[in-house]
């Protein structure tokens, strides 16, 4: 068998040095040379094989949350660490409370979201460093940046925490004339408004409004803060008035809506002023002050006309018709409702068409004008079928059926009172076909309607089957 010569291998200097240290090596190496070789090995390792520092080892061993906390403490940001740790504890409490109520907890813990932890570290430490130097405006900006970052449905409780922190810091800022304090009041008002605590929200919005009066401050989008304050206060007053009206506290509701109207006028926003007038008019209507309600709603219609806002004008006509209907002025109410129907049709507002036609049908039904009542109820029913809303279809179908019954009532009574053979034949014929019939008192004969109003959709078999006369 042939024997191959040994392969020549190229070894690195480190490998050569290591092999020389092996027990099988026959050479005796002096101590000085060993020290030199060790230095060569250390240098080689340093240059070619990078080791891990203590910090890098800790980063691999610890969770990201722990690493962030350790960094805060090591860098001397003890307040930031305490605040972050407190937020994590609060999250645990919220989770336990949800589990106690047998709710499925979907929100991930903060420690599992490194991006959020990075933002905590960045802004909290910057805020703490600025606070040590007394730069409270910078503290506010960093805390507000955190509030904006957590402004979502999942982390709203974190946002609210930083809104409260901003509110406290804003009291210490004296160099901007109170702008940051005004912004903080607005944020606290929003916080309480979302939680349903409207009285507290109104207090903060009132402070916001007072601080911005006569100022030309703008927010990041370029909108005047005073206008935002007026809008927020008007909105909160309206929500408060809704609660008062539900409790039949009409005087307080009207009082607070008058304040809302005054603030809306101050904001120089005609649309907001008209909206405030609309709700004030409805409050006067609910309290039975019809003349005052008409006066206020007329103001709303004037504003809507000047703004060329047809939808608002339609709402004004509808509300004024309700007031006139309550006063018994049916003729005037009909005029406004007919205008409302035209506006609703022109703007493709099907629900408004249904509402207006139903109101007109009710009025004509009460007046005994059953043909017109039936016509408007039929329009409401047809529109409800177009929007395919089952609830509205059922409701308008009932109204239409009642109006049709009233429409036929006089005719049927005439047949019964006539007591002749022709009338009897007409009654029997109607019972067999159930089609619409009209009675001619002069000729004493029945004429079948050539086409029933309800059968306007020959292809819609299901709608025909659901019509009142087929029930």
From Swiss-Prot:
Domain remarks in the Swiss-Prot or TrEMBL record: The TPR repeats are required for axonemal localization and flagellar beating.
UniProt xrefs under Gene3D superfamilies: Tetratricopeptide repeat domain (1.25.40.10)
Localization: Cytoplasm, Cytoskeleton, Flagellum axoneme
TPR repeats: 92-131, 136-173, 182-215, 234-267, 274-307, 314-347, 354-387
PROSITE patterns documented for this protein: TPR (PS50005), TPR_REGION (PS50293)
GO cellular component: cytoplasm; cytoskeleton; sperm flagellum
Any matching Pfam family: TPR_12
Keywords of the record: Cell projection, Cilium, Cytoplasm, Cytoskeleton, Flagellum, Repeat, TPR repeat
Function: Axonemal protein which is implicated in axonemal and/or peri-axonemal structure assembly and regulates flagellum assembly and beating and therefore sperm motility.
Name this protein carries in UniProt: Tetratricopeptide repeat protein 29
InterPro entries tied to this protein: Bac_ResReg_Asp_Phosphatase, TPR-like_helical_dom_sf, TPR_rpt
UniProt KW Iron-sulfur keyword: no
Gene Ontology biological process: cilium movement; cilium organization
Gene symbol of the encoding locus: Ttc29
């Amino acid at each position: 068998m042939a024997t191959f010569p040994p392969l020549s291998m190229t070894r690195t200097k480190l490998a050569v040095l290591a092999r020389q240290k092996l027990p099988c090596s026959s050479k005796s190496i002096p101590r000085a040379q060993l020290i030199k070789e060790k230095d060569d090995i250390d240098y080689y390792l340093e240059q070619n094989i990078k080791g891990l520092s203590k910090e890098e080892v800790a980063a691999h061993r610890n969770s990201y949350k722990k690493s962030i906390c350790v960094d805060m403490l090591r860098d001397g940001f003890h307040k930031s660490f305490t605040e972050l740790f407190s937020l994590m504890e609060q999250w645990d409490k919220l989770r336990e409370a949800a589990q106690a109520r047998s709710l499925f907890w979907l929100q991930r813990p903060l420690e599992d979201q490194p991006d959020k932890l990075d933002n905590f570290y960045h802004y909290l430490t910057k805020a703490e460093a600025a606070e040590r130097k007394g730069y409270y405006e910078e503290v506010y900006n960093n805390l507000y940046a955190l509030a904006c970052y957590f402004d979502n449905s999942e982390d709203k409780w974190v946002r609210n925490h930083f809104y409260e922190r901003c509110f406290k810091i804003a009291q210490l800022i004296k160099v901007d004339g109170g702008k940051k304090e005004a912004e903080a009041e607005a944020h606290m008002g929003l916080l309480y408004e979302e939680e349903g605590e409207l009285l507290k929200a109104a207090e903060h919005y009132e402070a916001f409004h007072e601080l911005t009066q006569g100022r030309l401050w703008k927010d990041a989008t370029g909108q005047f803060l005073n206008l935002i304050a007026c809008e927020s206060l008007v909105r909160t007053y309206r929500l408060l008035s809704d609660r008062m009206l539900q409790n039949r506290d009409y005087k307080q509701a009207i009082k607070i809506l008058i304040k809302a109207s005054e603030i809306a006028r101050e904001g120089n926003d005609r649309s907001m002023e008209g909206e405030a007038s609309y709700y004030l008019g409805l409050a006067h209507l609910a309290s039975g002050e019809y003349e005052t309600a008409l006066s206020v709603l007329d103001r709303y219609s004037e504003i809507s006309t000047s703004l060329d806002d047809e939808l608002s004008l339609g709402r004004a006509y509808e509300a004024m018709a309700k007031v006139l209907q309550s006063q018994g002025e049916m003729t005037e109410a009909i005029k406004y409702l007919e205008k409302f129907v035209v506006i609703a049709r022109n703007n493709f507002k099907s629900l408004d068409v249904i509402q207006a036609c139903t109101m007109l049908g009710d009025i004509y039904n009460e007046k005994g004008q059953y043909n017109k009542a039936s016509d408007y109820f039929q329009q409401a029913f047809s529109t409800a079928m177009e929007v395919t809303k089952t609830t509205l279809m059922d409701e308008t179908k009932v109204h239409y059926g009642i109006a049709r019954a009233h429409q036929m009532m006089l005719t049927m009574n005439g047949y019964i009172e006539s007591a002749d053979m022709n009338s009897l034949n007409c009654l029997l014929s109607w019972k067999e076909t159930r089609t619409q019939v009209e009675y001619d008192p002069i000729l004493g004969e029945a004429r079948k309607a050539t086409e029933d109003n309800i059968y306007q959709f020959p292809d819609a078999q299901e709608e025909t089957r659901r019509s009142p006369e087929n029930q």
